C-alpha cells in the first residue's frame, strides 16, 4: 500500500535555543502544564461533589455516574479530529480554543436546569479537553524533538497534580461557601485567565515548531492489516482497564461519603490521592520498559486487589488514602503507558497512529456507560457486589485475554 513516510523536520531544539532562553522555555512548559492541570481538575471535581449535585438536581445514582464521565464520548470523537483541526487552523488556535472551550462549559455547569442540560454541558467539556490535549502533546513533540519524552512526562505530572487538587480544593471550596457551584466558577474563570495569558505570552515559534516539513516521499510499503489478534486482545484489555477506572472515578467519592460516612472533604481527599499516584507516570513508564510486556499481568492483579479492597467496607480514612494512591500508581502510573506501548508494538511502525486511536477509543468509550451501569448495579446488588463486576472484575478478565497475546510476534523497538 502507498503511505506517507515520516517527514523530516528541521532540528527544532537547536533553532529554538537561539531565539528563546532556557528560562523562557521552562516558563512556557509551566504555563502549558498549568493549563493541563486545570483540565484534570475539571474532570475530577465533578465526581467529588456528586453527592451535593445529585441532591440539587434529584439525580439517581446511575444518572450521577453518567454525567460524571459523559465527557469521554467527545474526548474520543474530537481527539480523532484534533489532527485535522490543527492542520486546518494551526496548533495555537486549537490549543487556545480547547482551553477556553472546556473552561467556559465548566463555568456554565451550575446553570444547568436538570439532568439533560447538565449532561450536555458536561459532554461539551470533553470537546475542549480533547482539543487541548492533542495540541499540547503536538507542540511538545515538535518543539522538543528527541527530548519529547521528558517534556510529555512533565505534562503527565501536571495532570496528576490536577487530579489531586481538583477534588481536594473543590470540596473545601464547597465547605467554605456552602455551595458546590463555587468550584466550577473558580476553575472556569481560572482556565479562561490561563488561556488569555497563554495567548499573550506563548510565541508562534513554540506552537508552530516543526510545521515546515521537507517534501514528503510516497513510498510503497507492504504492511499487513492493522486488525491482528494481538491488537484486538490488547485493545479490548485496555478497554476493560478503562471500565475499572471510570467506574471508580465516577462513584468512589459517593461511596466513601454515603456508605462509609466520610465528610465531603475527606471523600474528596481520598479521591484526590489517585492524582498523586498518577504523578508517578514517568517512573511507571521507565519501569515498564525495564520489566517488559509481561509486567502487565502483575499490575492487573494489583489493580484488581486494590479495587476489591476500595469498595468492601473498610472505613479507615488513612487506608483509603493509601488504596486510592495505589490505584492511581497502578492505573495511570503504569498500566496506561504500558498498554499504549503494547498496542503500538502489536502493529507495523507505519500503523502506530491508527493503533493508538483504536486503543484510546476502547479506553474512553466505556466512560459514561461504566458510570451509569455501576450505579444501576449498586441499586440492585449493593456496592460490594457491583464493584466486583465493574471495578475489580474487568482487570481479571484482561489477565485472561492478555494470556492469549502472542509476545513472540510483538516488536521490540
Regions found by a protein language model. Give the residues of each.
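C-terminal transmembrane helical hairpin of 12-TM major facilitator-type secondary transporters
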Residues: 294-339
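Cytoplasmic helix-loop-helix junction between adjacent transmembrane helices
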Residues: 121-159
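Extracytoplasmic gate region of multi-pass secondary transporters
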Residues: 46-47, 229-282, 340
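Helix-loop-helix hairpin linking two adjacent transmembrane segments in secondary transporters
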Residues: 154-203
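Intracellular juxtamembrane helix-capping segments at the cytosolic ends
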Residues: 131-144, 333-347
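Conserved MFS/SLC helix-loop-helix module at the cytosolic interface between two early adjacent transmembrane helices
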Residues: 77-113
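A late C-terminal transmembrane helix in Major Facilitator Superfamily
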Residues: 346-383
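Helix-breaking motifs and short loop linkers at transmembrane-helix boundaries and internal kinks
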Residues: 58, 90, 111-117, 145, ...
Amino acid at each position: 500500500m502507498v503511505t506517507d513516510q515520516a517527514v523530516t523536520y528541521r532540528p527544532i531544539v537547536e533553532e529554538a535555543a537561539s531565539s528563546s532562553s532556557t528560562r523562557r522555555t521552562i516558563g512556557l512548559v509551566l504555563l502549558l502544564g498549568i493549563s493541563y492541570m486545570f483540565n484534570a481538575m475539571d474532570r475530577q471535581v465533578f465526581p467529588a461533589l456528586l453527592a451535593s449535585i445529585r441532591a440539587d438536581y434529584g439525580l439517581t445514582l446511575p444518572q450521577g455516574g453518567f454525567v460524571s464521565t459523559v465527557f469521554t464520548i467527545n474526548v474520543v470523537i474530537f481527539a480523532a479530529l484534533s489532527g485535522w483541526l490543527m492542520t486546518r487552523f494551526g496548533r495555537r488556535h486549537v490549543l487556545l480554543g480547547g482551553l477556553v472551550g472546556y473552561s467556559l462549559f465548566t463555568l456554565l455547569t451550575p446553570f444547568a436546569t436538570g439532568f439533560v442540560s447538565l449532561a450536555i454541558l458536561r459532554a461539551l467539556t470533553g470537546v475542549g479537553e480533547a482539543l487541548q490535549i492533542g495540541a499540547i502533546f503536538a507542540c511538545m513533540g515538535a518543539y522538543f524533538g528527541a527530548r519529547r519524552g521528558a517534556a510529555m512526562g512533565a505534562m503527565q505530572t501536571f495532570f496528576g497534580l490536577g487530579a489531586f487538587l481538583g477534588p481536594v480544593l473543590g470540596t473545601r471550596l464547597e465547605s467554605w461557601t456552602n455551595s458546590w457551584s463555587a468550584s466550577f466558577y473558580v476553575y472556569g474563570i481560572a482556565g479562561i485567565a490561563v488561556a488569555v495569558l497563554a495567548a499573550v505570552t506563548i510565541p508562534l515559534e513554540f506552537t508552530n515548531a516543526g510545521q515546515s516539513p521537507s517534501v514528503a516521499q510516497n513510498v510503497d510499503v507492504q504492511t499487513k492489516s492493522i486488525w491482528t489478534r494481538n491488537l484486538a486482545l490488547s485493545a479490548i484489555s485496555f478497554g476493560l482497564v478503562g471500565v475499572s477506572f471510570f467506574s471508580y472515578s465516577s462513584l468512589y467519592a459517593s461511596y466513601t461519603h454515603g456508605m462509609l460516612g466520610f465528610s465531603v472533604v475527606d471523600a474528596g481527599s481520598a479521591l484526590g490521592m489517585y492524582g498523586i499516584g498518577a504523578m508517578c507516570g514517568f517512573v511507571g513508564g521507565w519501569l515498564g520498559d525495564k520489566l517488559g510486556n509481561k509486567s502487565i499481568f502483575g499490575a492487573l492483579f494489583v489493580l484488581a486487589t486494590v479495587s476489591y479492597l476500595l469498595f468492601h467496607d473498610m472505613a479507615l480514612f488513612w487506608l483509603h488514602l493509601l488504596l486510592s494512591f495505589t490505584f492511581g500508581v497502578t492505573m495511570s502510573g503504569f498500566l496506561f503507558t504500558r498498554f499504549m506501548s503494547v498496542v503500538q508494538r502489536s502493529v507495523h511502525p507505519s500503523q502506530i497512529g491508527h493503533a493508538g486511536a483504536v486503543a484510546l477509543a476502547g479506553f474512553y468509550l466505556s466512560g459514561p456507560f461504566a458510570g451509569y451501569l455501576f450505579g444501576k448495579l449498586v441499586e440492585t446488588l449493593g456496592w460490594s457486589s457491583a464493584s466486583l463486576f465493574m471495578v475489580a472484575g474487568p482487570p481479571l478478565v484482561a489477565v485472561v485475554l492478555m494470556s492469549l497475546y502472542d509476545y513472540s510476534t510483538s516488536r521490540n523497538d
